[in-house]
Amino acid sequence: MKRSIEDTSIVFIGAGNLATNLAKTLYYKGFRIVQIYSRTEESARTLAQVVEAAYTTDLSSVATDAQLYIVSLKDAAFVQLLPEIVAGKEDALWVHTAGSIPMDVWVGKVNRYGVFYPMQTFSKQR
């Protein structure tokens, strides 16, 4: 059975420059962004409003039923929070955007994973 992009639910862990640009692009292309997590409410809420998603500042409240989780955090925060981020969501598809973190950071933590690292910088305004 072929799945349409509208059926793919995506959660963003992070709401910085890269997450903002990627979430907006995916949303405008028809993907369903279901939730945004950020440690700051303003960042989470601002991006969530644009992509018509729920938001949270509590990692334990991140949706557990999404098909794709895109982790776009600062590298050090990603490594520190990784066990908490993936708990209960090990069978989803996970990607991170951390340039200095290898893909094998996922090994033994989740079943499906990858790295999405654009070769350019982003700002929220562009």
Segments and roles (model prediction):
Residues 57-60, 118-119:
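Conserved SAM/SAH-binding loop
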Residues 85-91, 107-110:
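Short, conserved loop/helix-junction motifs that constitute active-site signature segments
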